[in-house]
Swiss-Prot record:
Family: Belongs to the sodium:neurotransmitter symporter (SNF) (TC 2.A.22) family. SLC6A19 subfamily.
UniProt GO BP: sodium ion transmembrane transport
Subunit structure comment from the entry: Interacts in a tissue-specific manner with ACE2 in small intestine and with CLTRN in the kidney. Interacts with CLTRN; this interaction is required for trafficking of SLC6A19 to the plasma membrane and for its catalytic activation in kidneys. Interacts with ACE2; this interaction is required for trafficking of SLC6A19 to the plasma membrane and for its catalytic activation in intestine. Interacts with ANPEP; the interaction positively regulates its amino acid transporter activity.
Name under which the protein is recorded: Sodium-dependent neutral amino acid transporter B(0)AT1
Entries under Pfam families matching the protein: SNF
Source organism (scientific name): Pongo abelii
Gene that this sequence comes from: SLC6A19
Amino acid sequence: MVRLVLPNPGLDTRILSLAELETIEQEEASSRPKWDNKAQYLLTCVGFCVGLGNVWRFPYLCQSHGGGAFMIPFLILLVLEGIPLLHLEFAIGQRLRRGSLGVWSSIHPALKGVGLTSMLVSFVVGLYYNTIISWIMWYLFNSFQEPLPWSECPLNENQTGYVDECARSSPVDYFWYRETLNISTSISDSGSIQWRMLLCLACAWSVLYMCTIRGIETTGKVVYITSTLPYVVLTIFLIRGLTLKGATKGIIYLFTPNVTELANPVTWLDAGAQVFFSFSLAFGGLISFSSYNSVHNNCERDSVIVSIINGFTSVYVAIVIYSIIGFRATQRYDDCFSTNILTLINGFDLPEGNVTQENFVEMQRQCNASNPAAYAQLVFQTCDINSFLSEGVEGTGLAFIVFTEAITKMPVSPLWSVLFFIMLFCLGLSSMFGNMEGVVVPLQDLKVIPPKWPKELLTGLICLGTFLIGFIFTLNSGQYWLSLLDSYAVSIPLLIIAFCEMFSVVYVYGVDRFNKDIEFMIGHKPNIFWQVTWRVVSPLLMLIILVFFFVVQVSQELTYSIWNPGYEEFPKSQKISHPNWVYAVVVIVAGVPSLTIPSYAIYKLIRNCCQKPGDRQGLVSTLSTASMNGDLKY
């Protein structure tokens, strides 16, 4: 076993000893929040981990990388990468009883940048994640009507036909791009604020504030609904989906394995990235949540339970999604065939009912033989069920276009629409609880807010400030900004944070010390699996994924898809290059958080080198006192 531990002077003065830990827990029982029960804690963690990405990212990756074959690297990396880091975050938060900023500052003052980066990433993700929730609320509000507003095109101003943009695309496309986003044709064309979206964004932040106003005291009550209702809705959709025509075709298509994909490095890279992001690791929220546990809570068992639920949910959601996609593909296949049948009937004046899907090819042959010239004038569509099933859609396109189109073809469509968007709302809201925790707690640890200010005020100021910045997402170009942040702002920083977390605990805090801490908390030392993954396997996997991600993102040109009615292949999305100034934006939103970690470490090094020996001794004494009083200031 690797036993390298880097020098870390003063560590014992910055953290509580195991003997003092239980005493401090009793003393802070009245001042520090704690969970009402174990179920409340687990539901909160599950709600934070299981988010919108499980709904619209995992099914797409399965479909793109060999169906059932993708499950193999996903499950392997879930065990070797996801569970070990989850256990580490649970254990270190429970042991040091602080948020992310306090935890890493306690381990080493130079690691404060890790906590700061987690806070910045949580802030950026919350910034655009709640915008998605506002879109979900807009669709939810519009679901309480019959027919659904995206089921048919609106009439033009003269009432003589449909709006041209809708007629050339589809009702679901038109409602999403024009009625909802009123999207521009470029990220440079900002346009104006869409007031309906602004009101929905205000509602989203207001709901989040009410749910997080007192931290876990309020979120702990809400998660009983937000973390369980999605599973109820998913089960209802699965039962309904399996009764729809073509549902099994979608499920079979999803899980039909293409084992050749296992030899594709991109498949393993995407599986590793999906495991990492689906656990919401490195945001700091899980560390804060675990810090509210009892000292002797079994964090090892918690990490396994949450991991199993998360992995099961990803697969379960994929089955539900593709049962509906199978139904949608079958409907489109039937519509395509009906159009071809109608073309053949009209071209040869055949009696209705004489041509069916079963005899269509034979009737084509007969018509071609009887009048080749007339047959040559007919234009038939290509109807292939696999092509409809293979239309890989992820992200907002899956939720707001593909699924909404499928819902319009279901009986009692408003009911299914309401259920679907309530489910998405709960998934998004419960994930935002963790993001808010990852911002509020570090700000409290930084002491930038006067201690006399109540937590309700701090939470309100954060929600208000983020809401004001979120105005950019209500512009005509808002969707492009959101996609930009989602694609480039958080991936690299999160991977860097996760690697630093694992390295810091194992080689700065010391894995042997960590093992003793866990033995004290749960009654036994971590077994050989945890030792191997923490010391070697998990850091190596994260480093490989980080390097690959960095190489891919740096080497590729920044492009994005736009909705352009003037595009010659409309309604297909047009892919264009980002303007040059976007590169500067990407460097700022991705580079600043990433560079915070080494920058703060260098700052501490320079500061320590410039201090006089007497000042250093005084600093150690101060840190020791602050550590015992629970008031670390670095």
